[in-house]
C-alpha cells in the first residue's frame, strides 16, 4: 500500500499530467529536494529507475560569467504560473483468498476511505531560459560531489514542479486483516487506524526534468527530446530508463537475483549478521534512516574505504572481508534491500511485527504464494505491458522478508 503522501502525489500526476512525463515525489522527506534548477541523478535499480538528489544546482557547475548568471537565474524561473485544486474521494473494500497445498488457507480483507482536498501551484523554468543552456561552459573547479557522480548514470535538470500552496493535512482511514488457517495452528495480522500526514507549504509533489549532456569536461548541453547518454565519452554507459518499471521478464529473473543476494550474505559471521540485521531493522518505517544508510553504503561502494568515525560503522564494516577488501556484491545486496524497502509503506509494519514475533518464515510463504499468482498473470501479458505497481510492491515485500530471514537464521559459514 502507498503512503498517504505518495497516494496524493500519484493523484496529482494522474490529474495534471495523465500520460505525460511528470514524476511523483514518493516521500515527504524528498518534498524539498526536487526544485527547479536542481540537478538529479538517475539510479538504475532492480525495481526500475528512480531519481535521487545530488545536492547540486546549475549555479554549482556552470561558469557564472560575472554577475550575468545571477540575473539569468532570477529571470529563468517564471514563478507561480497557476494554481489548481484537486479533490479525491475514495471508499473501497476488497477480499483475498489463497489456498495452498497441505491444508493451508490464506485469507485477507481490507477497507479504506479517504477524502483529500489539496491546492497546488505550478512553477517552471521558461523555455527561453532553457534555450540558453546550449553549449554552456562549466566551472574550471567543479564540486567534488559532481566529480564523484557515476558517469554511467544520467543527470537531469528539474524544469517544472507542482507544489503545495499552503499547509495541508491529509487523512486516510484503513483497516487490514490477514490470517492463515494451518493444520497445526494459525497466524493473523490486523491493523486498524487513521493515517495522517501534514505537508508544509511550498513542498514539491511532482516534477518534470530535462536531460543534461556533457560532451566533454568543459561544456554542457540540454537535451530536449528522447534519451541519450549524459556522459557520451563513457564507453560503458547505461541507457536511460526514465518512466520504466519492473517488467514480466524481470519478475521471472527476480528469483535468481534474490538467490544472489542471499548467497553473498551467507558468508557473514554471526556477529556481522546481527550488525547488519539490526541496522536494516532500524530502517523499517523510518525513511530518513533508510536514506541516510543508503547514502553511506553508496559512498563506501564508490570510495572502497571505511571511515572509522562513521556512525553506521558496524554495518559498513561488514561490507569488507577479513583482509579489509570491500566486497562489492555485499554492498550492492544491501542497496538492493534498501531499494526494495523504498517500494513499501504500511507493509513495513507487517514485516516489523513478523521479525519481532519470529514469524518471518510463514510471512515469506504467504507472500510467495500470492506473488507467484501475479507472475502467472504477467506471463500471459504482452511483453511491453507496464508492470502492475501493486505486483511490484509484492515483489519488494518478498525481497525484504527473504533478506531479513536470511540474516536472522544464522550463518552457514564463517569465511569472513
Curated annotation (Swiss-Prot):
Summarizing the annotation, the consequence of altering residue 15 to K is: Decreased ability to trigger pyroptosis. Abolished ubiquitination by S.flexneri IpaH7.8
Q: Which residues cross the membrane?
A: 83-101, 102-125, 167-183, 184-198
The GO annotation for biological process reads: cytotoxic T cell pyroptotic cell death; defense response to bacterium; defense response to Gram-negative bacterium; killing by host of symbiont cells; killing of cells of another organism; programmed cell death; pyroptotic inflammatory response
Work out whether the entry's keyword set contains Metal-binding.
Answer: no
Annotated cross-link (Microbial infection) Glycyl lysine isopeptide (Lys-Gly) (interchain with G-Cter in ubiquitin) - which positions? Answer: 177, 190, 192
Q: Which domain of life is it from?
A: Eukaryota
Q: What is the effect of changing residue 225 to A?
A: Reduced ability to trigger pyroptosis
Q: What induces it?
A: Expression is induced by interferon-gamma (IFNG). Overexpressed in inflammatory bowel disease (IBD).
- Residue runs in coiled coils: 248-276
Disordered, as annotated region: 229-250
Outcome recorded upon mutating residue 212 to P: Abolished ability to mediate pyroptosis
Q: A cellular component term (GO) from this record?
A: plasma membrane
Query: Where in the body, by tissue, does this protein show up?
Result: In the gastrointestinal tract, expressed in proliferating cells, including in the basal cell layer of esophagus and in isthmus/neck of stomach.
State any further remark: Long terminal repeat (LTR) of endogenous retrovirus HERV-H with reverse orientation may serve as alternative promoters of GSDMB gene.
Q: Which family does it belong to?
A: Belongs to the gasdermin family.
* This protein's domain notes: Intramolecular interactions between N- and C-terminal domains are important for autoinhibition in the absence of activation signal. The intrinsic pyroptosis-inducing activity is carried by the N-terminal domain.
Protein name from the UniProt record: Gasdermin-B
Q: Which organism is it from?
A: Homo sapiens (Human)
Amino acid at each position: 500500500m502507498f503512503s498517504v503522501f505518495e497516494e496524493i502525489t500519484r493523484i496529482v500526476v494522474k490529474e495534471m499530467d495523465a500520460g505525460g512525463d511528470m514524476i511523483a515525489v514518493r516521500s515527504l522527506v524528498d518534498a524539498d529536494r526536487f526544485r527547479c534548477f536542481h540537478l538529479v541523478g538517475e539510479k538504475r535499480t532492480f525495481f526500475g529507475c528512480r531519481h535521487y538528489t545530488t545536492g547540486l544546482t546549475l549555479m554549482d557547475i556552470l561558469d557564472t560569467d560575472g554577475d550575468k548568471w545571477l540575473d539569468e537565474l532570477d529571470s529563468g524561473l517564471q514563478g507561480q504560473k497557476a494554481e489548481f485544486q484537486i479533490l479525491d474521494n475514495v471508499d473501497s473494500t476488497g477480499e483475498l483468498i489463497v489456498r495452498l497445498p497441505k491444508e493451508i488457507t490464506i485469507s485477507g480483507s481490507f477497507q479504506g476511505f479517504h477524502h483529500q482536498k489539496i491546492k497546488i501551484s505550478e512553477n517552471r523554468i521558461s523555455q527561453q531560459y532553457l534555450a540558453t543552456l546550449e553549449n554552456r561552459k562549466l566551472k574550471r573547479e567543479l564540486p567534488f560531489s559532481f566529480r564523484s557522480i557515476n558517469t554511467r548514470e544520467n543527470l537531469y535538470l528539474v524544469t517544472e514542479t507542482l507544489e503545495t500552496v499552503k499547509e495541508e493535512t491529509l487523512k486516510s482511514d484503513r483497516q487490514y486483516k490477514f490470517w492463515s488457517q494451518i493444520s497445526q495452528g494459525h497466524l493473523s495480522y490486523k491493523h486498524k487506524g487513521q493515517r495522517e500526514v501534514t505537508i508544509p507549504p511550498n513542498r514539491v509533489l511532482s516534477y518534470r526534468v530535462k536531460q543534461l549532456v556533457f560532451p566533454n569536461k568543459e561544456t554542457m548541453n540540454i537535451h530536449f527530446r528522447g534519451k541519450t547518454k549524459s556522459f557520451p565519452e563513457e564507453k560503458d554507459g547505461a541507457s536511460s530508463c526514465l518512466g520504466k518499471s519492473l517488467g514480466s521478464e524481470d519478475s521471472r529473473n527476480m528469483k535468481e537475483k534474490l538467490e544472489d543476494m542471499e548467497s553473498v550474505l551467507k558468508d557473514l559471521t554471526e556477529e556481522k549478521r546481527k550488525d547488519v540485521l539490526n541496522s536494516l531493522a532500524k530502517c523499517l518505517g523510518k525513511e530518513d534512516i533508510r536514506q541516510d544508510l543508503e547514502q553511506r553504503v553508496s559512498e563506501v561502494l564508490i570510495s572502497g574505504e571505511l571511515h572509522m568515525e562513521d556512525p553506521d560503522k558496524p554495518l559498513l564494516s561488514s561490507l569488507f572481508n577479513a583482509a579489509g577488501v570491500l566486497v562489492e556484491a555485499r554492498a550492492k545486496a544491501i542497496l538492493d534491500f534498501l531499494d526494495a524497502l523504498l517500494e513499501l509503506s504500511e507493509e513495513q509494519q507487517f514485516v516489523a511485527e513478523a521479525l519481532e514475533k519470529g514469524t518471518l518464515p510463514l510471512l515469506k510463504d504467504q507472500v510467495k504464494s500470492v506473488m507467484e499468482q501475479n507472475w502467472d498473470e504477467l506471463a500471459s501479458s504482452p511483453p511491453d505491458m507496464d508492470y502492475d505497481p501493486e505486483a511490484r510492491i509484492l515483489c519488494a515485500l518478498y525481497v525484504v522478508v527473504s533478506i531479513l530471514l536470511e540474516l536472522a537464521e544464522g550463518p552457514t559459514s564463517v569465511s569472513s
